[in-house]
Amino acid sequence: MLTDPAVRALVAAVNAGDREAFHGVLTPDATMSDDGSDRDLQQWTDREIFGAGGHMDIESESEDGRSLIVRFRNDTWGEMRTAWRFEVAENGRISRFETGQT
């Protein structure tokens, strides 16, 4: 089980294909980056996760559960090893995540 409850909820939402739960764990102004470039969160998640059957298999976690190594797969790109880093706001919701291939 993942240590950080917000990160755990986000991973569960991704793996369930639950867009509503995914956005529910984010702050309204959440941001993200992919391979070092800021992206439009809504467009990116629609394309890479919810429109493509995205799935996260966790290899490891660090930084109190806010940094993950993940085997991420989707119908567009197949499977790749990725790093994910999360910033969690005081209200317990994710305000930013960064991902990229390792």
Which residue ranges define each predicted feature?
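Terminal "cap-and-tail" regions of soluble proteins that handle hydrophobic small molecules
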Residues: 5-6, 12-13, 93-95
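Surface-exposed, charged secondary-structure patches
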Residues: 42-90
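Short, solvent-exposed secondary-structure junction/capping segments
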Residues: 8-14, 23-39
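Extracellular/lumenal ectodomain signal focusing on beta-strand-rich modules
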Residues: 29, 57-60, 96
